Design a protein with these regions (language model features):
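Bacterial N-terminal signal peptides that target proteins for export
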Residues: 1-9
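N-terminal acidic, glycine/proline-rich low-complexity segments
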Residues: 24-207
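Bacterial N-terminal signal peptides
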Residues: 9-17
Length: 207
């Protein structure tokens, strides 16, 4: 019960921190959503319900965040549940059913181009979110950071940092952070120290 409460507090705190950060931005940037990536070791409800609860909580606030990726990865203390990406799809199926009612909050009638920058109040299509739901690292520990350990998740993180977008990318770590660590390793190998520094400056990590 304490862990479930802690995870809920983390999600709420993330909402408050990002909201405050964007409240201090210049007016022309104020209407754009903050960009977020979720790394989750989501598990069945009978094993660890807090991850699914956090996913549902995030989706009912999807009009406040530009969800760049939902990445299924390992936990920090076990081999993880990267193969349970289907649980994220279950949450998205529920989101799809509720979406018509959720859109009424902002009188939204249609969906914008999925690749366009999203304004606060915009509800993303379930197709957009499904395309952004991918696998990250499947193995835990530093010995699995390096050659042969790139994943769809780590590659997407790199591509997002390369996009022409001044907004920082918030990485919310609900499980292990190895997918992000692998992205850092890859950039470190392939780019100059200055380019690595520029890459790292794009991110804000919240665990």
């Amino acid at each position: 019960m304490r862990k479930i409460k802690t995870k809920s507090i983390v999600v709420i705190a993330l909402i408050l921190i990002i909201t405050q950060a964007y409240a201090n931005k210049e007016p022309e940037q104020k209407d754009l959503k903050p960009r977020i990536v979720v790394l989750t070791d989501i598990a069945p409800n009978d094993i660890e319900p807090d991850d699914m609860e956090s996913m549902i909580r995030l989706l009912v606030h999807a009009d406040q965040f530009e969800i760049e990726a939902l990445i299924a990865t390992t936990g920090w203390s076990n081999t993880g549940n990267g193969e349970r990406i289907d649980l994220i799809y279950d949450a998205l199926n529920a989101y799809e059913k509720d979406l018509p009612n959720l859109m009424k909050r902002s009188n939204q009638k249609k969906f914008a181009n999925d690749e366009s920058k999203q304004e606060i109040g915009y509800w993303p299509s379930v197709n957009y979110l499904r395309l952004r739901t991918i696998l990250g690292s499947k193995n835990m520990g530093m010995k699995f950071i390096g050659d042969g350990n790139d994943s769809d998740g780590s590659n997407l993180i790199i591509r997002m940092a390369d996009e022409n977008d001044e907004r920082p990318i918030w990485i919310s770590v609900w499980g292990g952070g190895n997918t992000f660590a692998q992205a850092i390793w890859r950039v470190q190998q392939d780019r100059s120290p200055e380019e690595l520094k520029a890459f790292l400056s794009k991110f804000r990590i919240y665990t």
